Amino acid sequence: MKFHLWNAAILSATLVACAPPQPPVLTPDPVTLQFLDISDWHGQLDPLSFGSGDTAYQAGGAAVLSVYFKQDRAANPNTLTFTAGDDTGGSPPLSSFFGEKPAVEALNLMGLDAATFGNHNFDGGLSPLQGLINTAKFSYVSANLTNLDGNLANVKPYRIFTVGGVKVAVVGLTNPEARELVSPTAFGSILITDPVAAAEKARLAAKAEGAHVFVALTHLGVTSVDATSKAPSGPLIDFANNATGYDVIFGDHTNVQYSSTFGKTLVVENLSKGASYARVQLTFDRNNNTVLQSSNTFVIPKTTAVTPDPAVVAQLAPYRTQLAAQLDTKLGVATDLFPRANNNERLGEVALGDLVTDAIRARYGTQLAVVNGGTLRSPLPSSYAPLDTTLRRPGPGYQSGPPYDVVAGDVYSVLPFGNSVVTRTVTGTQLYAVLENSVSALPGSSGRFLQISGFSYRYDVSKPVGSRVVSVTLDTGAPILKDAATYTLALPDFTNAGGDGYTMLADGQGTSRELDAQVVLDAIKTQGTITPNPNLGQRIKAVTVP
């Protein structure tokens, strides 16, 4: 035993003697870097309205955000500004009617440095997206898109910025399911790989180039928060738990405000459309190449606190003038708001969903109509800003309501994607599969959740995915069974092509009709006055079945 201990002592001494000398700890040289981030902006060029009565306020909009960002940069010039996908796509008419060019031009003026891609960046396909990339004065980065050659140019996995004497690597990551959330041809031959593996590969490459701070722009979000433990879940949390070596991870995609630390990594997601933005402070020791601390503050960019940036106002003015001739036409009157908030249209029946699906079903005389919750992008009336200030509108600068005047721009804000309605038949068996997909993500929110008309159904979220639908009933009271009986259905062409996981419908059936926005626009003109359904919860009900 003594012999073994003596040998061990010699071995230990030898290892100590052979170990490489540790670099001396130098006197700290701290610098604070600032990162600004907006999530899921969707070309929201105009401010949004929040609250009511004495608590009402407006926030966001390109000209307002631009001033806030300038103030932040004046306070700390060592600043980078980001967005983590869906900066365009699903946008209000002021951007969408001009191919999203106004949004990218505004982001240039707002001083954006880098962005990644979300699914909505691909809404128009590759050629329009390439045009926007070429218009951008900032960098688009995504490390988990492959086969870019021949599809998209000027897209790199990451970009290294030197800020405050520190090399900061900004790595982009696209949500893996993005291909199924847009038209099947929108990505060309581009494939999406695992974000964790791609993030590690990009980080190591950037590190080899001398980067010391690592930021991930991910189009990944928090999908739910446990009511009891308050523990979050979702792709952003999964990524944060598995990615290594990142100092800040920005999330996106789900319109959830979240900020926490995972070990030494700060993880942040904002509310969408500029309702809030993240202001991250990261202190880095330049002598010892270590992050000393990081923190985040959510900023609500209220319109009353600043004067809008005149450069952005001027940039948007010609687009507004062109748009007014098409979309300022008054269609009718809404007796109250048709709200869109808190992802409710992705969780249950909402008045806006009833309005749209009822209009589509009435237009084509089908028994059933469905629309993905993710199709509905704005309340009604919307943030669209007609030039006529005598109209009754929710925001400042107009006559007050309710009732509210509804214009064509509102409808195109609610339904900006240019989807055509398709009419077809489905069997009872197919309809059950459709509804199972609709409720598959619950209790988390998902754009696949369907708003419906012409029927009702009950589901039990405690049951396994694929076995949650309990019963389906026509408005006539007749039950729909899981059998070969057929029913007529109207739905968006995106859904009929298998988007959002509706592969059971991608069988080549269906007759293409008019644009969904045109159908709803005509319905409001015909009705004259529209009222939110006061009996929500009758079409879609959660139940518990023993």
Give, region by region, the residue ranges found by the protein language model.
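N-terminal glycine-rich, Lys/His-bearing helix-loop that initiates the first secondary-structure elements
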Residues: 11
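Acidic, metal/ion-coordinating pockets
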Residues: 19-307, 311, 347-359, 440-442, ...
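Catalytic centers of hydrolytic enzymes
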Residues: 26-38, 44-68, 181, 186-196, ...
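Bacterial N-terminal signal peptides that target proteins for export
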Residues: 1-7
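C-terminal motif of bacterial Sec signal peptides marking the signal peptidase cleavage site
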Residues: 14-17
